[in-house]
Curated annotation (Swiss-Prot):
This is Transcription factor FapR. It comes from Listeria monocytogenes serovar 1/2a (strain ATCC BAA-679 / EGD-e). Transmembrane segments: none annotated. The gene is fapR. The keyword Lipid metabolism applies. Belongs to the FapR family. One of its GO terms (biological process) is negative regulation of fatty acid biosynthetic process. GO terms for molecular function: DNA binding; DNA-binding transcription factor activity. Keywords: DNA-binding, Fatty acid biosynthesis, Fatty acid metabolism, Lipid biosynthesis, Lipid metabolism, Repressor, Transcription, Transcription regulation. Disulfide bonds: none annotated. Transcriptional factor involved in regulation of membrane lipid biosynthesis by repressing genes involved in fatty acid and phospholipid metabolism.
C-alpha cells in the first residue's frame, strides 16, 4: 500500500468523502493505511464533520421536501435515498442506547421503528398510517452494527387507500428483518 504525505492524504481524504459521504472512518483508515485516529484528526483539520453529521446533512438537503407523510426528523434512521411510491433506503447505527445492557443486542422496537418509519416515508400523501404489519426478526443485531433498511412499494391492486410496502433490513449482506406494512393514506383537506 502506498504511503501518502499528510498533505496528499488529506487532499485524497477530502475527495474520497466528497465522492462517498457515507464512507466510515474505519474504511478510510483501511484505504489510506493509517489509524482511525489519524483519519479523525485529518477530518477535524479539514473541518469535515463525522459520518453521522454528513448523513444528516445529505438527507436534509436531498429529502426534507420529498417526504410528505412525516417530518424528516421523525424518521428513525437516516434516509439516504427515496423515490415516493416506489422505494426508499435508510441507515441506522446501533449504539449503546439502543441495546440491552447485559448482552449488547439491539432492542427489537428500534428495528421495527426504522422499518415502519421508512414504509411511512415512502408514501406520497400527507397522511400515512400503518393499519397492519407482519414482521419477522431473522437474526439479532448487535451494538456497533449498521442496519440498512430497504423499502419497496407493491403495485396497487385496486383503488383503495391502502398500499403495501415490503421492507427488508440488512446488516452487511445478511437479512435481519423482513416486514410487510399495510399503509392507509390520504391527503389532508
Amino acid at each position: 500500500m502506498k504511503k501518502y504525505s499528510k498533505k496528499d492524504r488529506q487532499m485524497k481524504l477530502q475527495v474520497a468523502i466528497e465522492e462517498n459521504p457515507f464512507i466510515t472512518d474505519e474504511q478510510l483508515a483501511e484505504k489510506f493505511g493509517v489509524s482511525v485516529q489519524t483519519i479523525r484528526l485529518d477530518r477535524v483539520a479539514l473541518s469535515i464533520p463525522e459520518l453521522r453529521e454528513r448523513i444528516k446533512h445529505v438527507a436534509s438537503v436531498n429529502y426534507a421536501d420529498a417526504v410528505k407523510s412525516l417530518p424528516i426528523d421523525e424518521v428513525i434512521g437516516e434516509i439516504i435515498d427515496i423515490q415516493l411510491s416506489k422505494s426508499a433506503i435508510s441507515i441506522f447505527d446501533v449504539r449503546s442506547e439502543h441495546v440491552f445492557k447485559r448482552n449488547k443486542i439491539a432492542r427489537g422496537h428500534h428495528l421495527f421503528a426504522q422499518a415502519n418509519s421508512l414504509a411511512t416515508a415512502v408514501i406520497p400523501n400527507e397522511i400515512a398510517l400503518t393499519t397492519q404489519a407482519t414482521v419477522r426478526f431473522v437474526r439479532s443485531v448487535n451494538e456497533g452494527e449498521r442496519i440498512i433498511a430497504k423499502a419497496k412499494v407493491r403495485p396497487a391492486t385496486d383503488n383503495r387507500a391502502i398500499t403495501i410496502v415490503d421492507v427488508k433490513s440488512y446488516v452487511g449482506d445478511e437479512i435481519v428483518l423482513k416486514g410487510k406494512f399495510e399503509m392507509y393514506h390520504a391527503t389532508q383537506k
